[in-house]
Amino acid sequence: AIERICRIKEIDPRKNNLSIICYDLSSISEYAKVDNNIFKLMKHNLPGPFTFILNGTNRLPKIFRNRKEVGIRMPDNNIIREIARLLDAPIMTTTLPYEEHEDLEYMTDPELIDEKFGDIVDLVIDGGIGGIEPSTVVKCTDDELEIIRQGKGWLEEV
């Protein structure tokens, strides 16, 4: 499935940053190394619009095995988190492919997403109109936190 998504996006999964969505904080610790301070920070800010870059564990999906780091998300979206819970597995995530000349509605409207991608994906879930602002990316692999990209989320330190 991951390789199929990468073909659709025309990206190399070994070279591009991919993230996984986890259901809850306990499932995050299966796939990433989380110390007490980072755990408290994540507990305070998640679920929410953040991607935390953490050191990975050996339980990561195969496509991530040669990487030291992994992006972890726990979005404030009950649909995707419930799917991850029911699967009892993380879900790989990436942004939709977007070209500058395209209307942004094709990134946010489930009906338009289905119109554009319905022939090449198995399923489009209509969870309502989505937002276009990206997640805030926080690197937590060193001793100090680093905001790699300021997006929708404003990190509240504990």
Q: Where are the model-predicted features located?
A:
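Active-site-adjacent structural elements in enzyme catalytic cores
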Residues: 1-158
